[in-house]
């Protein structure tokens, strides 16, 4: 009987021993995904600018930083927060981005119907933001630092992206959303890097 009980305990022991390597592998995988998507986000932003016409892309052009409901750029104080809190903010931003990117894609389909690659990039970006956000949330759960309670839906995110009237404001708002997408992916990549061996979490 005692032998049987001992055999039942062995898998638990093995599981506890392998937890750390498994968690490290999960962190590396999520960090690699964030790194790859950051590169894609840079390509998306460059292609978006190229297809909007003048004055977009001109060195002298400084577009207004339109506010986007439900999403802002990473705050200057972000880097000083504990890494788990930073990752919670990253996950929230990644959850807010897909409806914004979807709305920009729909607007660009009207403004640039002959730019299928840009539209495909925007569609992919929305899916990729969802995937990375889910991966970050799963990692937080594995670390025992998941958000408590149901996640709040992004407030009026889609309405914000779709509400710009006129061609120029719509293009500027799309540029802002693509820029925020790149900023938050880069920030997420950096925050995940703090959890890797050699990081300063």
Curated annotation (Swiss-Prot):
One cellular-component annotation, GO: extracellular region
Cited InterPro entries: 4_helix_cytokine-like_core, PRF/CT
Annotated SUPFAM superfamilies: 4-helical cytokines
Gene Ontology biological process terms, A to Z: cell surface receptor signaling pathway via JAK-STAT; cell-cell signaling; muscle organ development; nervous system development; neuron development; neuron differentiation; positive regulation of cell population proliferation; positive regulation of tyrosine phosphorylation of STAT protein
Keywords: Cytokine, Secreted
GO MF terms, alphabetically ordered: cytokine activity; leukemia inhibitory factor receptor binding
Gene3D superfamilies on file: 1.20.1250.10
Protein name, UniProt field: Cardiotrophin-1
Organism for this UniProt entry: Homo sapiens
Gene: CTF1
């Amino acid at each position: 009987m005692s032998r049987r009980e001992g055999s039942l305990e062995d898998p638990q022991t093995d599981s506890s021993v392998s937890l750390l390597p498994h968690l490290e592998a999960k962190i590396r995988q999520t960090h690699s995904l964030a790194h790859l998507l950051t590169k894609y986000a840079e390509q998306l932003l460059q292609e978006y600018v190229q297809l909007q016409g003048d004055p977009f892309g001109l060195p002298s052009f400084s577009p207004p930083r339109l506010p986007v409901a439900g999403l802002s750029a990473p705050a200057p104080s972000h880097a000083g927060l504990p890494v788990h809190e930073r990752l919670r903010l990253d996950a929230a931003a990644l959850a807010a981005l897909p409806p914004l990117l979807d709305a920009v894609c729909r607007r660009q389909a009207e403004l640039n119907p002959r730019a299928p690659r840009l539209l495909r990039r925007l569609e992919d970006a929305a899916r990729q933001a969802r995937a990375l956000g889910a991966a970050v949330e799963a990692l937080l759960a594995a670390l025992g630092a998941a958000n408590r309670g149901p996640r709040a839906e992004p407030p009026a995110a889609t309405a914000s992206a779709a509400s710009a009237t006129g061609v120029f404001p719509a293009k500027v708002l799309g540029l802002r959303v693509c820029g925020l997408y790149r900023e938050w992916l880069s920030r997420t990549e950096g925050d995940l890097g703090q959890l890797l061996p050699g990081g300063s979490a």
